[in-house]
């Protein structure tokens, strides 16, 4: 029939449900008398946004393009990065009313078959009317829907999605959403940036260390300040203690009211700066914080050192690469503040222990959230900090991939004259013997 209809994308359809589905997504259906088969011709021409640079995951050195709302554009972008016949892209629809098109992408020679089967099982067993975005789908297929911790990675960058595909993960694309879902994921994935693989390992590890410090400051600093000023003044140097007491002398409120008021005010400023148009939003954020902080100190509502604590905490929260992990830290931070006010270091220790228990019990598609640390899977001690690119020989062992090895033990064969040359010495212009090899 392709010889009769000059169209590249022609498919046979024999059931009315398939025919109606194709009509709804904009295909043209051709019926021929005396033939019991309809021909679905891809003739749709929806308007769509062109490929643009990433808005939220910007990098200095890396690809400057992002996913769009069109599923076929997104799959072609992934196919361009992973130009291999083993890349499988399976289509399915979700939602009894919207019939939203989704694509499940994986490398069939790398990804674990049980992982792929589990992802497809969850997607095919959703009894729901509509799915509009990948964020809605994420809430339906994650392991623990009541936990505020993110359990899947979400990205707008095709190069990041391609990197995770090649490591053995599964990528799910939802039509109408410029963000794709990557599964499974572990905790350290949320502290990694899309730019890390493009940097030398020294630079990337410095940034990873800074993010790790920012994580603990964002989580613990306000609670520790409350605990120390309320219960553990003896650990503060004498001069600093006198400065703190003097700064709080004219403040009429207890420390818990003071810090909660400033934290909530900071969250209000952050939310306001996001919701207004971008040129005004930056101005509101800067001016609002300056005016509010200065006025609060002059009116003796809060102490100057508390303004510093809240400002440092707010700045470090912006250093967390993943938006959803940053949200989780902003919520849990209030629990640490209250625990520090009620019981000092003991209260913070109890909340921290409970937090660790939650992290240890959480799974993402059967993979422990704290892998490869808990459980310790690992011959591989390069779980968080990155080794040099030439030394990243194995894929993550907790993914149980079909091909654990991704690089040869000696990947830079040119350096040792391996392959097609009998000289095994490193090349040097100063060594005349090399020129004769």
Range-by-range predicted roles:
Residues 1-255, 365-394, 400-435:
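Cytosolic regulatory modules rich in charged/polar residues
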Residues 224, 237-240, 245-419:
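Generic detector of multi-pass transmembrane helix bundles and their immediately adjacent loops
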């Amino acid at each position: 029939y392709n010889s009769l209809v000059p169209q590249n994308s022609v498919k046979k359809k024999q059931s009315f449900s398939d025919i109606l589905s194709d009509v709804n997504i904009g295909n043209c259906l051709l019926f021929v008398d005396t033939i019991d088969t309809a021909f679905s011709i891809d003739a749709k021409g929806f308007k769509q946004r062109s490929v643009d640079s990433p808005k939220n995951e910007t990098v200095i050195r890396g690809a400057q393009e992002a996913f769009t709302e069109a599923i076929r554009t997104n799959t072609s972008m992934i196919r361009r990065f992973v130009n291999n016949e083993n890349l499988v892209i399976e289509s399915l629809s979700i939602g009894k009313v919207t019939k939203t098109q989704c694509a499940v992408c994986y490398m069939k020679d790398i990804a674990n078959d049980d992982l792929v089967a589990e992802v497809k099982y969850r997607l095919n067993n959703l009894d729901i009317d509509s799915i509009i975005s990948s964020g809605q789908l994420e809430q339906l297929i994650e392991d623990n829907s009541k936990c505020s911790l993110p359990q899947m990675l979400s990205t707008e960058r095709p190069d990041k999605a391609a990197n995770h595909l090649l490591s053995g993960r599964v990528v799910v694309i939802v039509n109408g959403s410029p963000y794709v879902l990557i599964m499974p994921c572990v905790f350290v994935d949320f502290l990694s940036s899309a730019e890390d693989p493009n940097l030398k390992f020294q630079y990337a590890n410095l940034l990873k260390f800074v993010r790790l410090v920012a994580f603990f400051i964002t989580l613990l600093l306000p609670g520790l300040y409350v605990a120390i000023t309320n219960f553990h003044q003896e650990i503060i140097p004498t001069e600093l203690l006198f400065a703190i007491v003097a700064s709080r002398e004219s403040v009429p409120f207890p420390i818990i009211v003071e810090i909660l008021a400033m934290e909530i005010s900071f969250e209000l400023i952050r939310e306001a700066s996001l919701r207004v148009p971008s040129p005004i939003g930056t101005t509101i954020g800067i001016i609002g914080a300056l005016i509010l902080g200065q006025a609060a100190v002059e009116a003796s509502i809060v102490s100057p050192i508390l303004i510093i604590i809240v400002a440092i905490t707010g700045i470090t929260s912006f250093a967390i690469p993943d938006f959803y992990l940053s949200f989780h830290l902003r919520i849990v931070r209030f629990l640490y503040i209250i625990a520090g006010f009620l019981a000092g270091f003991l209260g913070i220790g109890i909340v921290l222990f409970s937090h660790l228990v939650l992290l240890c019990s959480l799974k993402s598609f059967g993979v422990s959230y704290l892998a490869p640390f808990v459980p310790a899977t690992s011959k591989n001690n390069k779980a968080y900090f990155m080794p040099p690119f030439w030394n990243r020989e194995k894929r993550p062992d907790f993914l149980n991939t079909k091909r654990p090895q991704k690089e040869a033990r000696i990947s830079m064969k040119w350096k040792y004259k391996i392959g097609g040359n009998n000289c095994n010495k490193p090349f040097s212009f100063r060594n005349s013997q090399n020129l004769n090899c």
